[in-house]
């Protein structure tokens, strides 16, 4: 079983990448993720049985998205403590099964999208968004789709703005080795670099009409 170097039941993204057999996997904003391309829906669906077998053996509860183009396997974040230690053994088992089925890993397709709702310090808008979207609370400040199909929401206060105004931007979590290319593509498409002081953890971009997007890679590299 994969274990963290600290001997706990949890590990960081950096620790998970050091495990054997997990080269196909990247850690996004919703946890470890791998994408395997397929030739058809039936080809992609053949990975389900090995995933279920690994789930029953290791106790990892994945989210699996099967499409004609391929299959996405995610190990969703269920705790702020980090990635479950058993996740690396699960990931290696899934990757081995995918290779045997001639499914092709493509880490460049891994990503997750989050919505960052910046609220005035005197406001609490999380209940409104939870009610409107049918979401449930996740931790003290976030909200999630109960089936983890929609983007995760994060709520954090801002100061200096009038209470009547809210500001929201998208967080795009991508593999660390894909982040710069994604930033460059967005800038080429007319975007503006608003702030790169936190790079390579994340870059803040603005669209031509000033909508905000953060391209974030820190989830794929963080360590304790």
Residue ranges of model-derived segments:
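Conserved active-site tyrosine of GNAT-family acetyltransferases
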Residues: 125, 129-130, 186, 210
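Short, conserved charged micro-motifs
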Residues: 41-47, 82-85, 123-125, 177-182
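Charge-rich, low-complexity N-terminal segments
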Residues: 2-22, 29-32, 37-77, 85-114
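Iron-associated oxidoreductase/ferritin-like identity signal
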Residues: 125, 133, 149-156, 162, ...
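N-terminal beta-strand motif that seeds the catalytic metal site of vicinal oxygen chelate
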Residues: 99-124, 168-169, 219-224
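Positively charged, low-complexity terminal tracts
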Residues: 49, 130, 137-138
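Vicinal oxygen chelate
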Residues: 2, 66-67, 73-85, 89-92, 112-120, 162-183, 202-206, ...
């Amino acid at each position: 079983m994969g274990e963290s170097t600290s001997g706990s039941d949890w590990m960081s993204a950096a620790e998970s990448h050091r495990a054997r057999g997990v080269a196909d996997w990247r850690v996004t904003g919703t946890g470890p993720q791998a994408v395997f391309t397929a030739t058809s829906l039936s080809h992609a669906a053949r990975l389900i049985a090995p995933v279920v077998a690994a789930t029953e053996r290791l106790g990892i509860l994945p989210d699996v998205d099967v499409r004609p183009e391929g299959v996405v396997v995610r190990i969703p974040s269920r705790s702020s403590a980090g990635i479950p230690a058993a996740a690396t053994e699960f990931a290696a088992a899934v990757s081995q099964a995918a290779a045997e089925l001639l499914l092709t890993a493509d880490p460049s397709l891994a990503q997750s999208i989050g919505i960052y709702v910046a609220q005035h310090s005197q406001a609490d808008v999380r209940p409104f968004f939870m009610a409107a979207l049918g979401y449930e609370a996740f931790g003290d400040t976030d909200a999630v789709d109960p089936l983890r199909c929609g983007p995760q929401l994060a709520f954090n206060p801002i100061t200096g703005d009038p209470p009547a105004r809210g500001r929201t931007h998208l967080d795009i979590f991508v593999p660390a080795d894909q982040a710069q290319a994604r930033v460059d593509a967005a800038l080429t498409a007319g975007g503006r670099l608003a702030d790169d002081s936190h790079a390579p953890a994340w870059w803040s971009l603005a669209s031509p009409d000033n909508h905000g997007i953060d391209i974030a890679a820190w989830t794929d590299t963080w360590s304790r």
